[in-house]
Every structure is written in C-alpha cells, then in structure tokens.
From Swiss-Prot:
The chain crosses the membrane at residues 9-38, 72-93, 108-122, 172-192, 205-226, 268-286. It is a multi-pass membrane protein. InterPro entries: Mito_Metabolite_Transporter, Mitochondrial_sb/sol_carrier, Mt_carrier_dom_sf. This is Mitochondrial 2-oxoglutarate/malate carrier protein. It catalyses: (S)-malate(in) + 2-oxoglutarate(out) = (S)-malate(out) + 2-oxoglutarate(in); malonate(in) + 2-oxoglutarate(out) = malonate(out) + 2-oxoglutarate(in); succinate(in) + 2-oxoglutarate(out) = succinate(out) + 2-oxoglutarate(in); maleate(in) + 2-oxoglutarate(out) = maleate(out) + 2-oxoglutarate(in). The keyword Transport applies. Keywords: Antiport, Lipid transport, Membrane, Mitochondrion, Mitochondrion inner membrane, Repeat, Transmembrane, Transmembrane helix, Transport. Ubiquitously expressed, but highly expressed in the anterior pharynx. Solcar repeats lie at residues 7-95, 103-194, 203-292. Catalyzes the transport of 2-oxoglutarate (alpha-oxoglutarate) across the inner mitochondrial membrane in an electroneutral exchange for malate. Can also exchange 2-oxoglutarate for other dicarboxylic acids such as malonate, succinate, maleate and oxaloacetate, although with lower affinity. Contributes to several metabolic processes, including the malate-aspartate shuttle, the oxoglutarate/isocitrate shuttle, in gluconeogenesis from lactate, and in nitrogen metabolism. Maintains mitochondrial fusion and fission events, and the organization and morphology of cristae. One of its GO terms (biological process) is lipid transport. It holds the Pfam family Mito_carr.
Length: 306
C-alpha cells in the first residue's frame, strides 16, 4: 500500500519514539522493580520476597526518588529502540498490506519480529545502561558503578570495558525483542481488528485499551524467560576474564538448577504491571498522535497507525 497522501515515514518513526518515551515516564519505577527482581538471587540469596517488598525496600534504603534511577537511560532506550521498532513496523505494515485485504496474523508476527530485531540492535547500548543503572543500588557500596546519567554510563563503559561491551548480551536482547514484537505488535493489530469486526466496539481509546491489555498479557508470558537471560547477562561482571554466564542457555540452565523453573518468570507481576500499562500508553499515545495528524495536517479521515 502506498504511503502517498498518508503519514510520512519520518513522522511515523517520530510518533513511535514519542509514544514510548511518554509511557516510560509513567512506568519507569515498575521497570526498576522488575530488573531488581530478576537480579535477585544472583548473589546467592533471595533479596526480595515480592514486588511490593522490592519497591518498599528500595524507597526505604535508597530514597523515594530512587525508583526513577536510570530514567535517562530508559528515555534513551525508547528514543532508539521504540522509535526504530514502531516506525519500522508501521512502514512494513503499510508496505505489505494490500487495499481492503488485512494481513494474516502470521505475517504480522513476521513483520513484528523483523522490526523488533532491528530496533533492539539499535537500542542495546541504552539497554545496557538502563540495566546497570536500575540495578546499581542493590550492590554493596564498594561495588556500585555510580553512573551519573546515561551519557556518563555509555562513556565509562566504552572507556573502561571497550565499545563492544555496549552490545554485550545483544543476542538475547535481539531474541527477546523479536519475541516481544511478534507477540505485542501482531497481537495488538489482530485484537484490534477482531474487536472492530465484532461491531461492539468503535475505533477509539477504549478499543485501543482493550487491544493493548490483550497484547501486554500475551507478550509478558512469551518473553519473560528471554528477558531474564538478557537482564542477567547485561548486569554480570567479568572477573579475571571469566564471565558469570556464557550465553542465554547457560543462564536458563543455572536459573532452573539453582532457583527452579518458575524463576524464569520471576518478577512476573512488575513485568506485566510495567509492560501492560506501557503497552496501553504507547499504543494510545501513538494512535492519538496519528489521528491528530490526519485531522489537523492531512484534513481527512483517519487511517489506523497499526
């Protein structure tokens, strides 16, 4: 389908990043709790009994505003990863959709995986900084990296550990992104299509909300095992040239052996509480910006963003 007369591709990319950054401002504390829960157990003891215990412990021991540690990295991640993935998906969706003939769920999943893989490679450096900055407070004082912000984190990582460290864990990061986007983008598009086809829901914020919640749940279940592997690899320290984990399979093996198979879904509550609202807010903001562009710039009927 041609882009002629529609939203320019550069605007689609800008909308994607803006939507992701807006959502991150709201859910950053949940992302921090999720990361802390996934790192709990790496020191040989279970640091947090639950998500609420993690949240209260962080505020008590590190201060109320500590829940926003790593915000600059979170925003940069959205500016790189989400800008690329949503912009690429919107572009591919338009490119491969024929007039009056919706794409199959399988094809949407393939496009989502492609967009996610590309976006994740671009966003991995910010992801590394985010994982380290949100996890720093759980370490003993003498072991903390104490990054002052995302620029300081990226600069120090490059200087102290080499530029390639910015892409450490890139494989599980890309794998996670492909799983997330295949589930999230395809499920959102499909759920929205089904809701509108039912005739019971009109195309608007409520429809976008329902489709987003369905998408968020499916994505959480599918992606958590990959996410915990990514989190632990990106947070690990290399001692005497020996990394704690060799690869994602090594992480899964050690987690299952030492913590049990359900530990692969450790932090499910904050993960879904973060991913659910983040998915909802991202898609609603994206759809509203898209609608406003059609109404005030193109001055014609709205065509769905995704």
């Amino acid at each position: 389908m041609s882009n002629e007369g529609g939203v320019p591709n550069v605007v689609k990319f800008a909308f994607g990043g803006t939507a992701g950054m807006g959502a991150t401002l709201v859910v950053q504390p949940l992302d921090l709790v999720k990361n802390r829960m996934q790192l709990s157990g790496t020191t040989g003891k279970k640091e947090y009994r639950s998500s609420m215990h993690a949240l209260t412990s962080i505020m008590k021991n590190e201060g109320v505003f500590a829940v926003y540690n790593g915000l600059s990295a979170g925003l940069l991640r959205q500016a790189t990863y989400t800008t690329t993935r949503l912009g690429t998906y919107a572009f591919l969706l338009e490119r491969f959709t024929e007039k009056d003939k919706p794409l199959s769920f399988g094809m949407k999943a393939v496009l989502g995986m492609t967009a996610g893989g590309i976006g994740s490679f671009v966003g991995t450096p910010a992801e590394i900084a985010l994982i380290r900055m949100t996890g720093d407070g759980r370490l003993p004082v003498e072991q903390r990296r104490n990054y002052t912000g995302v620029v300081n984190a990226l600069t120090r990582i490059t200087k102290e550990e080499g530029v390639l460290t910015l892409w450490r864990g890139c494989t599980p990061t890309v794998l996670r992104a492909m799983v997330v986007n295949a589930a999230q983008l395809a499920t959102y598009s499909q759920a929205k299509q089904a809701l509108l086809a039912s005739g019971k829901v009109q195309d608007g914020i409520f429809c976008h909300f329902l489709a987003s919640m369905i998408s968020g749940l499916a994505t959480t279940i599918a992606s958590m095992p990959v996410d915990i592997a990514k989190t632990r690899i990106q947070s690990m320290k290399v001692i005497d040239g020996k990394p704690e984990y060799k690869n994602a399979f090594d992480v899964w093996g050690k987690v299952i052996k030492n913590e049990g198979i359900f530990a692969l879904w450790k932090g499910f509550t904050p993960y879904y509480m973060r991913l659910g609202p983040h998915t909802v807010l991202t898609f609603i903001i994206l759809e509203q910006m898209n609608a406003a562009y059609f109404q005030y710039v193109l001055k014609r009927d709205v065509t769905s963003a995704l």
